[in-house]
């Protein structure tokens, strides 16, 4: 897509990155200027690679690029492989929910409408964007995954059947924009 943008003389390439690029940083909140050279998953490495490619295209071809690091997006029409949908489905079906790091995970959940608003603003403000830019797109309000599950339980009026497991390789313990 970025190469097509260059060939079709698109003036501003906006792309989705991810909070996963931060890995398991201890210092929070995450800042766009933090070092992201040590991804802990292949997904994070692919997002970091996209950022590097965008930076290089921006430099070589004078193409404005803006990367948006999304933090745990949720809402209607979301991906069915993401925690909110998995948790709801499994609670409703009486199935076990696997909760990693023994329940000590935190996520900076971001509602999809907020993501759409930011994307629209970045596109509309293209003339005022610098050559290469990265933005964190989150709420700056990490929520414990167990609190999130308890909220779902309250809404559904049904208790979750939880299986606590250790952290998996590549899992990020906390995200915080």
Regions found by a protein language model. Give the residues of each.
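Conserved active-site helix of classical SDR/Rossmann-fold NAD(P)-dependent CH-OH oxidoreductases
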Residues: 48-55, 85-88, 116-117
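Heptad-repeat alpha-helical coiled-coil signaling segments
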Residues: 72, 76, 105-107
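Generic structural signal for alpha-helix termini and adjacent loop/cap motifs
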Residues: 4, 8, 25, 60, ...
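Catalytic helix-loop patch of NAD(P)-dependent Rossmann-fold dehydrogenases
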Residues: 3, 7, 11-12, 21-67, ...
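C-terminal substrate-binding subdomain of Rossmann-fold SDR/epimerase-dehydratase oxidoreductases
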Residues: 91-177
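Short, conserved SAM-binding segment of the class I
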Residues: 1-4, 151
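Residue(s) in the substrate-gating loop at a strand-loop-helix junction
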Residues: 18
């Amino acid at each position: 897509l970025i190469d097509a943008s260059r060939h079709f003389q698109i003036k501003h390439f906006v792309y989705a990155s991810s909070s996963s690029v931060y890995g398991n940083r201890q210092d929070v909140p995450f800042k766009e200027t933090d070092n992201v050279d040590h991804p802990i998953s292949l997904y994070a490495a692919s997002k970091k690679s996209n950022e590097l490619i965008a930076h290089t295209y921006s430099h070589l071809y004078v193409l404005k690029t803006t990367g948006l690091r999304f933090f745990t997006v949720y809402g209607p029409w979301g991906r069915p492989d993401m925690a909110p949908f998995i948790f709801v489905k499994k609670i409703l079906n009486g199935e076990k929910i696997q909760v990693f790091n023994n329940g000590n995970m935190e996520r900076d959940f971001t509602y999809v409408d907020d993501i759409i608003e930011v994307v629209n603003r970045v596109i509309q403000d293209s003339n005022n964007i610098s050559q290469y830019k990265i933005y964190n797109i989150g709420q700056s309000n990490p929520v414990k995954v167990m609190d999130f599950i308890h909220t779902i339980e309250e809404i559904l009026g049904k208790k979750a059947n939880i299986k606590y497991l250790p952290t998996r390789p590549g899992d990020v313990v906390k995200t915080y924009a």
